[in-house]
Amino acid sequence: MKSVVRSKGTQALFRRFSSALGDSINPNQVGVGDNVIRVNGRLFEVDKVQEKGLKTSVLDNGTKVITLDNGGSVAQLTFLYKDGPVYENIFNAGISSFMKHALTKDGLTSSEYITKTFLQKAGIIVHEPTVVNKSAIAFTVEGFRDTLAQPAVADKFWQSLLFPRFSPENVKEVKRLVELESKETKRDSPFAYLQDILHKTAFKGSPLGHTSFVPAYNLGYIDSNKLFDRWDAHYGFGNIAVIATNIEHEAVLAAITDSAWVARAHNKVGGVAAPASKYSGGEGYDVVHRAKEFDDQFTDVYSTYTAYAFKAPGRSNLKEHAASLVIAQALSNAVSPVLNTSFAPKRLEVFYQAYDTVGLIGLSSVQASNAQLKAFKAALSKIGTLSEADLAVHKSAALLTAYGNVESWRATQATLIDSFNTTGQPLSPLEIVSAIKAVSADTVKSVVATMLGSPATLVHHGDSPCAPTLDALQ
């Protein structure tokens, strides 16, 4: 490794770093790429070799800001990840494989999706891990100064992305396994050993609420006491659910750009929202909150509803809006036997919420399940294949509702009118009736195909059967 001459102040910091880490590290034998190391909740700066005269500065939370030649800047923050020679094998396997195994459990969306989709939207790059010594590696994230400069982001949000969590009841087992590894127990495959530990311990129990968390293999080295102990909000991006904690929500949202579809869900007890382990990824649509394990801890499981939905046409396109009304009616017809024969914990309700240019067609349910969402998607897919004759019964049912709206409209002397506009004038319920009559199987097929082109997303979790709002479409 290249030798770097460091100031006395930096060497003093590194001696403190070495002491806290419990390893003997020569401060002059550190890789060029290492910049900030966090140990026991404290940040230790390691001077970065100046290249091309670039200026650097360190913010209060340890983020290093590098000023570029063009006047711009880039921010970097490094997290230390320590315990056992197994990390050398992790490094060789590459960050993608490591994050995949560390963050994937029961179908949780893979790290590739996290790094390529979510982090890109936030303007964040995760660099290849750097081996600090034989038993520690450092992950560096790089992004915008305004993003990484926020203490809430640096201390909590990025840790929740980079480090898997163990529930309290599994901490003892984790420590036992790590202790075995620290004694340099000979193993044929260290990486397989890591996978085994993660699959046996990660995300089990109830990783929620007012409980302490221990990042995998961290055991205090990254100041577990400062990790979050309660969930505040859920951020959904397409088919990935990223769980934030009690941080500055608006600050995080501001760091996410363009087309991210943000769905927020708040529970009445302690601001608790769904944990990462209760989501599953897989084929791209399979995102669902397994509500029972979550609800039992905080609220009455029989009165809390979870709603997930597909993006659908809004009200600005009359033809597609009418087709969406028929599709929603067909889905409702499909679940009506369940509505009629099941008791409260399995109650389902299909909804279509239409706004100006976008809408939601989804399913609200008590005790939502992964299988339920798959069945809902399958029903939606089948509707896209219906013939004109088969579609007729669903059009008739949609017309019954539309005619009911017409009668209400007439009874109030046309003061209740539909709110969307295609020609500059408000559209009346009579025009919606005409549009439903004109819906064709081809139009339904086209709308369904577009809906299935984007994954389902959690849009509501709370006391009411269904209350998704425009906030879910931001």
Swiss-Prot record:
SUPFAM superfamilies: LuxS/MPP-like metallohydrolase
Localization, UniProt: Mitochondrion inner membrane
Membrane topology per record: Peripheral membrane protein
Cellular component, GO annotation: mitochondrial inner membrane
Annotated keywords: Electron transport, Membrane, Mitochondrion, Mitochondrion inner membrane, Respiratory chain, Transit peptide, Transport
Transit peptide extent on chain: 1-42
One GO MF term attached to the UniProt entry: metal ion binding
Major subcellular site: mitochondrion
Protein family per UniProt: Belongs to the peptidase M16 family. UQCRC2/QCR2 subfamily.
Annotated function: Component of the ubiquinol-cytochrome c oxidoreductase, a multisubunit transmembrane complex that is part of the mitochondrial electron transport chain which drives oxidative phosphorylation.
Binding partners and assembly: Component of the ubiquinol-cytochrome c oxidoreductase (cytochrome b-c1 complex, complex III, CIII), a multisubunit enzyme composed of 3 respiratory subunits cytochrome b, cytochrome c1 and Rieske protein, 2 core protein subunits, and additional low-molecular weight protein subunits. The complex exists as an obligatory dimer and forms supercomplexes (SCs) in the inner mitochondrial membrane with cytochrome c oxidase (complex IV, CIV).
Name of the protein: Ubiquinol-cytochrome-c reductase complex core protein 2, mitochondrial
Taxonomic source organism: Euglena gracilis
